[in-house]
């Protein structure tokens, strides 16, 4: 460890003596000292339940609550590994994620998605669990000696195959993100970090929660992002820094503009996948600096915008990052779309848990393959051009198409299904599905919507926004669906298209 390369445990150490700063949540405030103590009690209670012969992995299926944050503290203190579980996943899909990550049990709350019946889980809002943790309230707070390479957390994301992968996030990866953002914006003890992005996502953990710990200021947690309450929360908690991923800037900008919007304490906002025009508009309207970066949970390719980066560009390509032809691996000429790769190695990618095949594919030939498409201009600035493979970016979440297709194939009138992205009018993608119906049947949008509602393993973000009904799907000679053609034709195709109301 060095002053600029601490572990997460070392970030938390000074917080254990702080009483005048801490965690804000709704109408409550908990000092850092008490929050760290709560984490120690949770760790002790969990240790009594965990089998020491198995990986100490604990699934977390919670909204942004102090308990979620305290569970991250518990992990840093004890070596227990929190596993962020995405509530978009349901039923057998969620059970598969839990099994893939070797979770011994899952922490849920009153607002959590339903956990499969055969999975051991704890309702952290229950009186029984509250008493169980309270029994350890006098547990001595001990800061274990962690190594930078030690596993801190597993965070699920979707890969090119559509199947979720558990990304390994070490102490180094999480802590250095917090330190970097703290230094970039000169954050300190007087700052309040507003975290409304979901803590099961890497964005909230790395550039939200870890930033609050690194700057030794305070953190304000929002259970679930709300555009209408964003400015009210900033003023209520005195928030000076906030993070985002995807559309939140656009959602906030869509709220009615008032003359005093810039009268607020917010001074810095950091995130990724913001709409270029909205980044500037947000900064002007609310009187703050907005910096939009490019990266992923894996962390193999990261691009930082500079002050002279053109509008719409990701930033200049760093050393070792190239845009190559996905088929040949040769560098692409200026203006030609190719895959972003890291030729220097894995970068910040630390591997997938329990998925050697996916990890080998990601690092084929010793090169990190991001699965993201881009092109560069004459000055060397990169521009995002979509995603290679079978996945979509919807409302800040990576969604695989295969799990959605498996659900839609249950629709009784469908004989063939293809799911693919179409551009969202604001940012990212919308889900579109092409169906081939059984002979003698007609598409009924109300019937289809009722079917979607009844599917226990289909989250709302996975619902198709549009359904195309076709006589047949375009296929290759090896019978694979040509999804790039479907995506290119979009909603303006020759076939009938129905919008599906969520």
UniProtKB/Swiss-Prot annotation:
It comes from the Bacteria. Pathway: Lipid metabolism; fatty acid biosynthesis. The lineage of its organism: Bacteria, Bacillati, Actinomycetota, Actinomycetes, Mycobacteriales. It catalyses: a medium-chain fatty acid + ATP + CoA = a medium-chain fatty acyl-CoA + AMP + diphosphate; a long-chain fatty acid + ATP + CoA = a long-chain fatty acyl-CoA + AMP + diphosphate; hexanoate + ATP + CoA = hexanoyl-CoA + AMP + diphosphate; dodecanoate + ATP + CoA = dodecanoyl-CoA + AMP + diphosphate. This is Medium/long-chain-fatty-acid--CoA ligase FadD17. Catalyzes the activation of medium/long-chain fatty acids as acyl-coenzyme A (acyl-CoA), which are then transferred to the multifunctional polyketide synthase (PKS) type III for further chain extension. Also involved in steroid side-chain degradation. Activates cholesterol metabolites with a C5 side chain, including cholate and chenodeoxycholate. One of its GO terms (cellular component) is plasma membrane. One of its GO terms (molecular function) is long-chain fatty acid transmembrane transporter activity. Keywords: ATP-binding, Fatty acid metabolism, Ligase, Lipid metabolism, Nucleotide-binding. Coiled coil: none annotated. SUPFAM superfamilies: Acetyl-CoA synthetase-like. Gene3D superfamilies: 3.30.300.30, N-terminal domain of ligase-like.
């Amino acid at each position: 460890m060095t002053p600029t390369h601490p572990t997460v445990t070392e970030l938390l150490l000074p917080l254990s003596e702080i009483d005048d700063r801490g965690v804000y949540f709704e109408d409550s405030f908990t000092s850092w000292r008490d929050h760290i103590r709560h984490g120690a009690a949770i760790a002790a209670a969990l240790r009594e339940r965990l089998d020491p012969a198995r990986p100490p992995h604990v699934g977390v299926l919670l909204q942004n609550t102090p308990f979620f944050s305290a569970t991250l503290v518990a992990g840093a203190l004890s070596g227990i590994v929190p596993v962020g579980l995405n509530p978009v996943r349901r039923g057998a899909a969620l059970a598969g994620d839990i099994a893939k990550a070797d979770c011994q049990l899952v922490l849920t709350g009153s607002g959590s998605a339903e956990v499969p019946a055969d999975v051991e889980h704890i309702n952290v809002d229950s009186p029984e669990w509250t008493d169980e943790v309270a029994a350890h309230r006098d547990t001595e707070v001990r800061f274990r000696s962690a190594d930078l390479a030690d596993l801190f957390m597993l965070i699920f994301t979707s890969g090119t195959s559509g199947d979720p992968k558990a990304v390994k996030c070490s102490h180094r990866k999480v802590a250095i993100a917090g330190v970097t953002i703290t230094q970039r914006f000169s954050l300190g003890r007087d700052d309040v970090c507003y975290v409304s992005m979901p803590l099961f996502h890497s964005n909230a953990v790395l550039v939200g929660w870890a930033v609050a710990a690194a700057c030794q200021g305070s953190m304000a947690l929002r259970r679930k992002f709300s555009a209408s309450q964003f400015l009210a929360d900033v003023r209520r908690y005195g928030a000076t820094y906030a993070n985002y991923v995807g559309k939140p800037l656009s959602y906030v900008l869509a709220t009615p503009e008032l003359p005093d919007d810039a009268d607020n304490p917010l001074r810095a906002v950091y995130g990724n996948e913001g709409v270029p025009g909205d980044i500037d508009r947000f900064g002007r309207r609310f009187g703050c600096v907005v910096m939009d970066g490019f990266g992923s949970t894996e962390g193999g390719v990261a691009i930082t915008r500079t002050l002279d980066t053109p509008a719409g560009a990701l930033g200049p390509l760093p050393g070792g990052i190239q845009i190559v032809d996905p088929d040949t691996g040769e560098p692409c000429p200026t203006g030609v779309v190719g895959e972003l790769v890291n030729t220097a190695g894995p970068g910040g990618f630390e591997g997938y848990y329990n998925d050697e095949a996916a990890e080998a594919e990601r690092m084929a030939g010793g090169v990190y393959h991001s699965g993201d498409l881009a092109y560069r201009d004459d000055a060397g600035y990169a521009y995002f051009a979509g995603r290679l493979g079978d996945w979509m970016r919807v409302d800040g979440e990576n969604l695989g198409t295969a799990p959605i297709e498996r659900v839609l194939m249950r629709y009784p009138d469908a004989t063939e299904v293809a799911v693919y992205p179409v551009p969202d009018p604001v940012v990212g993608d919308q889900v579109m599905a092409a169906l081939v119906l059984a002979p003698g049947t007609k598409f009924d949008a109300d019937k289809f919507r009722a079917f979607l509602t009844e599917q226990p393993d289909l989250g709302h973000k996975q619902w198709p926004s549009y359904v195309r009904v076709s006589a047949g799907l375009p296929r290759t000679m090896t019978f694979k669906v040509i999804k790039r053609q479907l995506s290119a034709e979009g909603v303006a195709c020759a076939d009938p298209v129905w919008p599906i109301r969520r």
